[in-house]
Amino acid sequence: KADRIQDLWVMSLPNATPESVGVSTVSQRDAALKGNGLPWMMLPGTPGAHIMIPINPMVKSSTISDQAADEIAQALLPLPEDLRPTATVYKYDRKTGERIVLRKGTGYVECMPRDPEDGFTRCMNVVSAPRRDMAAKLKAQGKSEAEVNEALAAATKAGTLKPTPFGTLSYRLYGKKDRIQLLWVLSVPGATPESIGVSAAPQRDNALSGNGRPWLMLPGTPGAHIMIPINR
């Protein structure tokens, strides 16, 4: 019936908090009932903590845009509105890999303006900042993507770099229609379809046609993650 969210996925994350995951706790029930919902956390910090993932009905024409009045406003677009006021906005010096803070925030999420190379606008949990900072410096040194990943893996194994926590959420926005335009990514290191009950069958084509559902990528690896396309 239409008086409740009709298609809802629930991801259990016992004892997780908004800070540890990087997700809002503002209910999206009303928005979801209108076919425009976003994931949100319920019962944070308890054994019953979970993320509600409403699957919006198919959209024939997306209303998603990555355009904004200025660089800071544009960087914040992937986030739900309640997380935007406190988010840090930054970018990297491509020659040195040093972090350049455009706006210092007080929240647990930070965003980067649209990348001129790949066109993506990204927001991430601050807990993963050391990994991104290290990667940026290695790229500035001319390291390949494979070399960067190897260095991150080695540092993690050595204990000098903390692994990405299970359940960490990141956000990605893309302005053109040849890719998934609004995508949330939930890191689930080591997870498999059997351990979390999520299909590994890609939903890219469905998402591009406005009817995407979550799916698991890189199952059973440290980089395992759930792709959550947002139909809007």
Q: How would you describe each model-predicted region?
A:
Residues 1-232:
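Primary mode marks residue(s) on the alpha4-beta5-alpha5 output face of response regulator receiver
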